[in-house]
């Protein structure tokens, strides 16, 4: 059996008084150290842990990646594959698939695991839904994932823009199945508004990532709330019983097997149908360190545990991401493409 790789990382919590002051200009990205160094969570003396053999990524040859990037730039579109430095970008792009990120490239949150830029976002681009729909139709995609940055500056958290994108895609590519990966719509009245808006044109799959176990939220997802995310998933399912719900969790941030199992049970108790489980990889030295690399055997054990809980589909493996092979996951859960 493969031996787990583990170590302890010191975490230093910096108060708001001593954290670097924020200087935000609309549309300007804060990335890497500029982003994390202004967060209330800092990481001290955390050397990079050597990646085990099962984390290696094969980079395919050919021009497919550059061709798809050119198509995206032509239509002024952004993919989370690029913005979040996803390790599967070459495989997905070489197969002509992508997860589109709407509502800009600047997020209002500073999650310590995420490589998407922080800052003050620009207003939503009213032409984006049409551009997205045109690209989806031109690429002949059978299944598309649409996600976004957090937009705490918007009263509906960006829900109307999601609906506009769904409607535009269905008009241009009616056979395309649509999965949305949404933020948490956290804030007074925001979840209510978002769910009401999404009900006007719901997706084929509703995905919202729980990301980590509740004990790690203060260091990993500052600004988010574990129970809020569970409630969002459950409320959407209650409104749309026939639409598949989905969530995802990262491993390697300091969680235990027992904590992960509890989180999986919580997700099932809140009527989540599908789950993705994958290894966290540190985007830059400024981000949350990798506490350990979970082994392939452990991912297999979690897959079996999730299946026993009654998830309709469990994708569990070191390189699994929430939208990686999303079409296959949806097909496994009965969502026809």
From Swiss-Prot:
The keyword Iron belongs to this UniProt entry's keyword annotation: yes
Where in this chain does the record put each Radical SAM core domain?
A: 93-312
Q: Which Pfam families match?
A: LIAS_N, Radical_SAM
Reaction catalysis annotation: [[Fe-S] cluster scaffold protein carrying a second [4Fe-4S](2+) cluster] + N(6)-octanoyl-L-lysyl-[protein] + 2 oxidized [2Fe-2S]-[ferredoxin] + 2 S-adenosyl-L-methionine + 4 H(+) = [[Fe-S] cluster scaffold protein] + N(6)-[(R)-dihydrolipoyl]-L-lysyl-[protein] + 4 Fe(3+) + 2 hydrogen sulfide + 2 5'-deoxyadenosine + 2 L-methionine + 2 reduced [2Fe-2S]-[ferredoxin]
What does the record's cofactor remark say about binding? Binds 2 [4Fe-4S] clusters per subunit. One cluster is coordinated with 3 cysteines and an exchangeable S-adenosyl-L-methionine.
Disulfide linkages recorded for this protein, renumbered to the chain, are none
Residues involved in [4Fe-4S] cluster 1 binding:
81, 86, 92, 323
SUPFAM superfamilies the UniProt entry points to: Radical SAM enzymes
UniProt GO molecular function: 4 iron, 4 sulfur cluster binding; lipoate synthase activity; metal ion binding
Q: Write down the PROSITE patterns for this protein, in alphabetical order.
A: RADICAL_SAM
The record, for NCBIfam families, names: lipA (TIGR00510), PRK05481.1 (NF004019), PRK12928.1 (NF009544)
Q: Please state what the protein is called.
A: Lipoyl synthase
Species whose genome carries this gene: Xanthomonas campestris pv. campestris (strain ATCC 33913 / DSM 3586 / NCPPB 528 / LMG 568 / P 25)
Lineage per the UniProt record: Bacteria, Pseudomonadati, Pseudomonadota, Gammaproteobacteria, Lysobacterales
